[in-house]
């Protein structure tokens, strides 16, 4: 049989040969090159192999086919073919490898004895007939420790405990060492001793013979727990101090935040108060302007603002002539029952307007029945009807320059009109003569 796809032709002859003698460990073989293996010119050499028992591998034995018969006819036929057992022919002699094993456990001879020993069921039962009478209480009669065995308390044993209790009536709480000593003397367990002392203390309490402070634990345990409580108290105090410091820091931070918030609130309140005060002043100004007898209107022409305020005063009117831009012109009208002032001014702040309104109201509150002399030559008759009067025209010429006359007329906040001259010297720039004030007949007599 050959495998050409691997590149190495194999023959049907056996490739592994084992020696019959058990002492031989290796077979002599000649060296062969790779080319010889590829060509297959040289015969297959014998390879060294450990001698195994042929019964283990079962390559050349007929029992293999019978054993494989349980897997079906195809597998049995394949196992019985000549190609499979031809690869591993071994000698029938048992090798020396298994010589160290126990001879009684050989596969054929020892099989019957081993299975017969397994067939005895009695050897594997843990039950023993000699201990049958102790089936349920097998260890009941066995004393494991004579000293630690539980023993009922008698008068002799309890007398020792009573004597110790009478000696320690002020503190009937035995320590652990004393309990162990009493248990050894009375041959009782430690639990019995502790229970007896607990019952004895309870009886003394009922009989009102209690002469000790109520203590629930021994001195050593109390000391140990006292130390633990002290350490816990120190830790608690430290934690309390840390917590207090943290709380103080938190309070300081919260106080700073509160102060900042309060300052911000105060600033906002001040701003609101300023706005409210300004609003109140504006409202009062509007109310005062509405209560005036004459309308107060503000109109802007270009960049100039003309303010017109009605004041109860003599019949004088100061108007701006159309076509005159150099200076103001003064004219008096007898037909108007009020004093109207027209003057150009720039935008004034609110405080100035409030002061102006206050002074205007002060002028308005003055009694209008007091006529003031304007000039020795110009006088008005209070009873003269306005229709019979002619318009009084004041010339443009004045005794001084316009830039100095207007501040004299309007510079005083009280509007001192008594010093306003209606008769002025001729201006050097104009050649027109001065026009005197003319009144109807009978006006000077009044």
UniProtKB/Swiss-Prot annotation:
Residues 208-273, 362-394 are annotated as: Disordered. GO terms for cellular component: chromatin; nucleus. Residues 217-226 have a biased composition (Basic and acidic residues). GO terms for molecular function: DNA-binding transcription activator activity, RNA polymerase II-specific; DNA-binding transcription factor activity, RNA polymerase II-specific; RNA polymerase II cis-regulatory region sequence-specific DNA binding. GO terms for biological process: cell development; neuron differentiation; positive regulation of DNA-templated transcription; regulation of transcription by RNA polymerase II. Pfam families: Homeobox_KN (PF05920). Residues 256-273 have a biased composition (Acidic residues). It comes from the Eukaryota. Keywords: DNA-binding, Homeobox, Nucleus. Its main location: nucleus. The keyword Nucleus applies. SMART domains: HOX, IRO. Residues 146-208 bind DNA. It is found in: Nucleus. PANTHER family: IROQUOIS-CLASS HOMEODOMAIN PROTEIN IRX, IROQUOIS-CLASS HOMEODOMAIN PROTEIN IRX-6. Belongs to the TALE/IRO homeobox family. Transcription factor. Binds to the iroquois binding site (IBS) motif of target genes to regulate gene expression; functions as a transcriptional activator or repressor. Modulates expression of RCVRN, VSX1, BHLHE22/BHLHB5 and TACR3/Nk3r. Required downstream of retinal bipolar cell specification for the terminal differentiation of type 2, type 3a and possibly type 6 bipolar cells. This is Iroquois-class homeodomain protein IRX-6. It comes from Homo sapiens (Human). The lineage of its organism: Eukaryota, Metazoa, Chordata, Craniata, Vertebrata. The gene is IRX6.
